Amino acid sequence: MGAASGRRGPGLLLPLLLLLPPQPALALDPGLQPGNFSADEAGAQLFAQSYNSSAEQVLFQSVAASWAHDTNITAENARRQEEAALLSQEFAEAWGQKAKELYEPVWQNFTDPQLRRIIGAVRTLGSANLPLAKRQQYNALLSNMSRIYSTAKVCLPNKTATCWSLDPDLTNILASSRSYAMLLFAWEGWHNAAGIPLKPLYEDFTALSNEAYKQDGFTDTGAYWRSWYNSPTFEDDLEHLYQQLEPLYLNLHAFVRRALHRRYGDRYINLRGPIPAHLLGDMWAQSWENIYDMVVPFPDKPNLDVTSTMLQQGWNATHMFRVAEEFFTSLELSPMPPEFWEGSMLEKPADGREVVCHASAWDFYNRKDFRIKQCTRVTMDQLSTVHHEMGHIQYYLQYKDLPVSLRGGANPGFHEAIGDVLALSVSTPAHLHKIGLLDNVTNDTESDINYLLKMALEKIAFLPFGYLVDQWRWGVFSGRTPNSRYNFDWWYLRTKYQGICPPVTRNETHFDAGAKFHVPNVTPYIRYFVSFVLQFQFHEALCKEAGYEGPLHQCDIYQSTKAGAKLRKVLQAGSSRPWQEVLKDMVGLDALDAQPLLKYFQPVTQWLQEQNQQNGEVLGWPEYQWHPPLPDNYPEGIDLVTDEAEASKFVEEYDRTSQVVWNEYAEANWNYNTNITTETSKILLQKNMQIANHTLKYGTQARRFDVNQLQNTTIKRIIKKVQDLERAALPAQELEEYNKILLDMETTYSVATVCHTNGSCLQLEPDLTNVMATSRKYEDLLWAWEGWRDKAGRAILQFYPKYVELINQAARLNGYVDAGDSWRSMYETPSLEQDLERLFQELQPLYLNLHAYVRRALHRHYGAQHINLEGPIPAHLLGNMWAQTWSNIYDLVVPFPSAPSMDTTEAMLKQGWTPRRMFKEADDFFTSLGLLPVPPEFWNKSMLEKPTDGREVVCHASAWDFYNGKDFRIKQCTTVNLEDLVVAHHEMGHIQYFMQYKDLPVALREGANPGFHEAIGDVLALSVSTPKHLHSLNLLSSEGGSDEHDINFLMKMALDKIAFIPFSYLVDQWRWRVFDGSITKENYNQEWWSLRLKYQGLCPPVPRTQGDFDPGAKFHIPSSVPYIRYFVSFIIQFQFHEALCQAAGHTGPLHKCDIYQSKEAGQRLATAMKLGFSRPWPEAMQLITGQPNMSASAMLSYFKPLLDWLRTENELHGEKLGWPQYNWTPNSARSEGPLPDSGRVSFLGLDLDAQQARVGQWLLLFLGIALLVATLGLSQRLFSIRHRSLHRHSHGPQFDSEVELRHS
């Protein structure tokens, strides 16, 4: 909004001067000095005539100097401008003092009203009242404030070469960016760069300005500014107008706030609070039309922002002004004179000159030279600005023959309103159609609402800002707002009236009012509020004069010469008459009136009220103290992309290319895993690099996006996932090294064998696994256990420290603290570690009772030499290489041996079951639930048995997705037994998950969290393993049903499920601590066994040393597969089972439920699986279980009968729960003290030197005391659990064998 350069005042005659040394006083030309006049009205007439001819000369020089400076800010131009300013002040002082000297007693009694107005203006000296030194100081302050504002720049963080000026750079950012952080940076940068340096200058300016105007008889500068409106009730009248208009603003504010909430979300928009000031499309949130695209009521209607059409048609700045001129001439108003086109600056110069870009219209006071200075951009809102500025020029042209003192608007608001009146016609769809910017005009209700809302974003949004700026300045001038409260009061008013808040913390070092042009340039602002009311009064009157009938907002006065004639009369009057008279002649009323404005916006007012009521909007901002948080990674992340269309295009391309790359990688990986050779290893490494390059390429591109600003949740989720480059973040050399280490570790593990002295060698699968499962000979088990760790674990130790270094480096490059932090992030749960600990504590009593019972059974079999009833259990005696599941020693611990056997292996072998038959049965279970059958490719391409052709393969069971929507496979060295039947269902669960989400984008083809993927197959296995289901498969002779049969069944399940809980918990407890550095490589093995003792109550059967690496003997460690997923899976599978049993209509104990053939259960499961990773896992949990949290209650319910029985048995035998003799080992039973010829001691199963052992003893003493306290607490807990369990009904089981998931 340009200030009209026609009124004598500091903001008009004294704009920009550089801060230079004070200029010497210049003598006024004698011909410009006042002569001698009589002190009566006749003399005053001659005085006024003489003043007018002299003033034209002085004002021309002053304006010309200011123009030269504003269009080329240099020191020389500043010096010349200051000279001109001082001369104009000297001229004002000479003539003003003469006017006071001659006419002070009598001028108000003159009969000629125009003469009174002229003398009144001349006698007001303003800054010319000041003595020379202060006058020079005053001029310097004005010039420096203007210079600071006009040359302020905002530079990118750490990039001083990339800096933005306000216009057009920052203005464009505020208008077009939808990035919260970018908008914030531009907003904060401008307010700091322009505002902060101005504060001390503004304090000094205020003091000098008040001093000057007090000498003219005003109480302060604000009183002088208000005097132009010649109304004693002016302030009250404005307040009354504002109150009339406020309801419309409140409804607009609430509607826009809701739209911004849709875009920026809860974090940045409070639906009961103020709106952050940088989000409304404008640096000062004074007009909101630039966010019209975000708030448009009916987006399917024709677009009323014709900017794109203007650009397509090749509009330029000159054409925009020609179009505006043609509107004025169509009303038979004056065309622009030649000087206008020759002298104006209509675009920002391309030659590098510093200019004042703020749009303004200039009167050079010679009655022929009128210019506009505007850095015009080809946009629709700038087209309105063009008409606004040309309105000033038209005013100048119409009153140019009046005396200089009367060349002004009837009041300042009149001058601002004229161009805007025409812009109200220009912006109508009908007029835009006439000038070729709209293809057609639709006047239906929806199009009307679109148009009126667009106008409201410009006109209604501005009202509180137009009102408050001078409320603040009047407070400053009067002293009500001292300099210690400049910023506080500014934001108090902006929140009170506009309902906006600063987006970052502001304090009194800031001077945010100074970041608005009119404050440092000393241009009064209330004129704009007045003009926004007046222009609608004018519009209504001119439409009536033009003969228009219909809705006011559709009126276009284009080509109405009658309207032009009526307007001309107003313009030609200048300020020669009281504005009230001029207004009455124009509209028939002598006061400002909000009714035409309210009438214009009535349709959209009603629509907004209805919308806000429907949405339950709160009008106003009751939570007025709310402020938004700073964005993450601010300000470094400000240049991130937030455009939804660009993000969508990126996601489509990523998905298309990923399907190809991931398919090729999966094929190469499959070929390696099913045929380990140098050639397949080489190809896999190549594909590894290919997929790393793909990940790096698209991950790097994804990091250009600010996911926090994207609104499409699917696109947001995909891009956030793709931004994590994982290992591909590593530099090429380190990535190659990392891939080779992983391959070396995995190959070492997969080809390791343990050999007898006779030369025969055993592999892990199936040989050593069978030994651990079936042998009951202590030494044979020890040989297999120790041999596997010597071959697999020790060999992997050499690679592991470098692996840790590189995986941590990759995690840090992806923004994580370490690799553990990265792995935990997959659960999107900040409290994950605390939640897991809570779940473990809930289940620990069940594990301790099972541990004590099994230890007693092992004591019966192996004797006191090998089993201590108060100590940990040797790790090799539990039927499994890692003692993670104990079901293989069921025969040693079976509660009721005489009850019918539940081992179906013999029946399966007798009936000729094959691995393929086992998977067919699993497929049949899924299809019985209405779920998908596996496709033909599955049967043709899977490896369901260990090859007999001598190939080396990775036997560890795994499920594979080949990313083409039809190829899904399982790799498993299946043995015909019940355990592998359960594993087959587990693996088929992965395949079913793959099939259910196959149509999602590649990045979302995962489980809701990693535990979900592991749980699905196990949920079905919980049904498959029931005696009822095994009987239906003809694998058991009866369904059982007796209490003894139930306890046997639950014991078998507990040996799988409960025994696994502490192991699945501790593996990643160990790795997370390795990754965070709290476990060093020197202590890898010692800390591994500390955790296995603490959580599992196990000890190594032979001493271990630092040279051993027993974690490496577990597949998931060398293969870098996170393990906590299995702990999560074992918890949630029972929650799923309980919920699906309810859906299936099951009644009775949860452990007897079989959901086979329940379509209802299948539907519930399918709905959750189809989500893949597209939603946070609690939503998938809600779909299955009806609530969003992980809970151990279903698992406890499932095993409650067993817990009751175990507790009774353990009490009967006086079992000690836990392992109070925690430092016992089988080796220590044979020999305590130094090992032969070594100088070392066996301690906690570890081979340590004496000093290490002494430190360990002190640590264990502390642990012992802690364990005693824990045991006492546990007793109380068991009592309370037993007490509570009497009042609970049963929940459900789950069944799982952990496997590697190869799908990602």
Curated annotation (Swiss-Prot):
Residues 1-27 form the signal peptide. Chloride 1 binds at Y229, R527. Disulfide bonds join C155-C163, C357-C375, C543-C555, C755-C761, C955-C973, C1141-C1153. Its cofactor is Zn(2+); chloride. Coiled coil: none annotated. This is Angiotensin-converting enzyme. The keyword Glycoprotein applies. It comes from Pan troglodytes (Chimpanzee). Dipeptidyl carboxypeptidase that removes dipeptides from the C-terminus of a variety of circulating hormones, such as angiotensin I, bradykinin or enkephalins, thereby playing a key role in the regulation of blood pressure, electrolyte homeostasis or synaptic plasticity. Composed of two similar catalytic domains, each possessing a functional active site, with different selectivity for substrates. The active site is at E389, H518, E987, H1116. GO terms for cellular component: cytoplasm; extracellular region; extracellular space; plasma membrane. Belongs to the peptidase M2 family.
